[in-house]
Design a protein with these regions (language model features):
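A broad, structure-centric signal for solvent-exposed, well-ordered loop/edge residues
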Residues: 8-9, 63, 125, 206
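C-terminal, well-folded lobe of enzymatic/effector domains
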Residues: 95-230
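Functionally constrained cores in energy, signaling, and assembly domains
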Residues: 7, 55, 219
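Betabetaalpha-Me/HNH-type nuclease active-site subdomain
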Residues: 17-101, 106
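Cleavable N-terminal signal peptides of Sec/SRP-targeted secreted and luminal proteins
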Residues: 4-22
């Protein structure tokens, strides 16, 4: 009898870390501005030509008490069909890599960005969104939320120098009066450059919510004018 109890306790202890690590309450959908990325990371900017739209950085599960990362050890499944690779690459390119060819796209270096996002973030929602679903649903969010169009509603366009408050309020209105997450990088002796904009959703991805104030990166943009590089 004691042996059975011991085995049950051991099983519970083994399963608990998975349950805790996978307990996410919301999702942050993060899109990046390619010119902003390259302004912040000039030595890493390898994609040519650069996309002229906001592209996906990732979909990041979290809860309201801590940031969730690397929740499980589930491996990434490489795409082997070029059309599948290209469809994902159109909205989720790796700006730190040149475009591959039909001959070498299967090499992990051309899928390492997706592998990183899956292992670091995707595994934290794996109990609800297995790998294929995680990537497809993230791309669907990109199709529904065009950040350039949202910014244009406030007459904010690439090449302009808006205030951080105007960018924040424009996105706020575009997503039904919910708080977004902005991220800027300030090059030496320059104005902060807009790099990323995040929109937060319920765990089911059905409803936009305020991005939690305790994890906002908007402070990286300062309080004045920012650069929206063209």
């Amino acid at each position: 009898m004691m042996g059975i109890v011991f085995k049950l306790v051991l099983l519970i202890l083994m399963l608990c870390p998975l349950t805790i690590n996978s307990s996410f309450q919301y999702l942050t959908f993060v899109q990046q501005w390619p010119k902003g990325y390259c302004t912040a990371n000039p030595s890493r900017c390898q994609r040519n030509p650069l996309p002229t739209v906001f592209t996906i950085h990732g979909l990041w599960p979290g809860n309201f008490t801590k940031i969730l990362q690397n929740c499980r050890t589930t491996s990434y499944t490489k795409l082997k069909n070029f059309q599948d690779w290209n469809n994902r690459n159109l909205r989720w390119p790796d700006l730190a890599k040149p475009s591959p060819t039909m001959q070498n796209f299967r090499e992990l270096r051309f899928q390492s960005f997706w592998e990183h996002e899956w292992k670091k973030h995707g595994t934290c929602s794996e109990n609800m969104y297995p790998e294929a679903t995680y990537f497809s649903r993230t791309i669907q969010l990109s199709q529904r939320h065009n950040i350039l169009n949202y910014l244009a509603m406030g007459n904010i366009r690439p090449g302009s120098n808006p205030t951080v408050s105007s960018v924040n309020s424009t996105i706020y209105r575009a997503i039904s009066n919910h708080v977004p997450d902005l991220m800027c990088v300030t090059p030496p002796r320059q104005t902060p450059a807009l790099v990323e904009i995040g929109i937060c959703f319920t765990a089911t991805m059905t409803t936009i919510i305020d991005c939690p104030s305790q994890f906002l990166r908007t402070g990286s943009c300062g309080i004045g004018t920012i650069n929206f590089p063209a």
